[in-house]
Structure formats: structure tokens, C-alpha cells
């Protein structure tokens, strides 16, 4: 069977059709393979892997070389979904030339597009230059984790009409610069609805309510890998933490009681 690849143009057309599309993070080959088989439309190698896969405190600690390794692994497991890589902190903020080079490295190892956080005149110019270079860009407004320190923590953005209008203004500028989609993170549902209705590119909700064109979650939250914390806007569809611990305990017991390996499990 021929598998039809999801492209940037596919995502753009979904906006006009009124349908929704799904986005999940993945950080390794097998997870990417399984969620691709499940029909997820966009797979994001999020810089959230800094915390979920590498144990860092924030996304600030992950670098280009690490993101390349994870991107290569994920891309190898995907046949259908659009593969997007989060550009890590300081990989694109210093100068246009190095930013294009770093983004290009992600494309070389298998990404179909990159995601860039924030808004400034520099960012607008960068998006334009990247698109001209042949690198599709997913923009990201609202709460932007790489700006955690300047935003004063994990705070909801766009709570007033003025703040919403400002996000919309920035979003329209990014749209004109060439971004093919926009993540809205931790934005009130009504604000995100207003922004979505006034853009021609699709919006992706990360805690921004149901009226965006797509929803994105971290795969670890969806799978239930952690019991300590789950964001308010996330939904658990499984209990992988309990499953993993149970399997490991049973293996440990079988080893220590001598029941593993059995005669059927040796040469």
C-alpha cells in the first residue's frame, strides 16, 4: 500500500477544509513509528525532550547536537506524518547565518520543518530567510518556554483583549513572513478562537482550547509516563509508568527465583 506523506501543503489545506489535525511529540525511533502508524498527522521532536528524555530542569539545556540525534531517530521511524523539529535555545537567536545553518542541519537529518519560538523583527526576518532557503517554519506564540525567565514563569498569555490583539498582530506578521502554522500555548480558549478565526494559517493548541485547528501534547503525558505532574491541559490515555514498573518487577522476580530463562529461552 502506498502511504501518502503529510506535507506542509497538506496542513495548510486542512485549515480551509474545517477539519482538525493531531500533533504529538516523539523522541525515539520506536515511539515515532507507533504513533505514525496510529495516524498522528504531525510528529514534533520537541525541546521538551530536555526534561522528558534527558532529565534537565528546563528546555534551555538542550543543544543542536542533541536535537539532531533525536531528530534522526524519529525521522527513521516515520513514513506518513510531517516531522517538525523544535529549534533549541540559542540555536537561532544570535545571527541569521548560523540560524539557517542550524535549521538546515535538522532538515539534513530528516526533519520536514522547524519550529521557532517568539516574535521580534529579527524573528520575522529569520522566518522569511528560512522559507526562502527552502526550510518551512512553524511559529510559536503565547507562552514560549524558551522565554521562561523573561515571562516570569509559567504564566497564561493573552488574558486581556489588548494582549490578545497583540498576539494576533504578531501572528499575522509571522504569517506574512511565511510561517505555515502557529502554535498557541497557554492562551485562554476564547482568545485562541479569535486569533484562529483571523488567520489564514492553521493554529495548533497547546493548552489553548478546542477552537484551534489542531491539538498538540507531549507523548509522555498522553501515555501516562509520570505520576508526579500532568499539565492541566493534558489528558492521560494510558498508565505507562505502572506498566513499565510492573514489567520490570516481574522480570526481577523471575531472575531471582530462577524461573527466567526457561528451557524454551535458551540455545
For the regions a protein language model found, what residue spans apply to each?
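Alpha/beta enzyme core
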Residues: 2-267
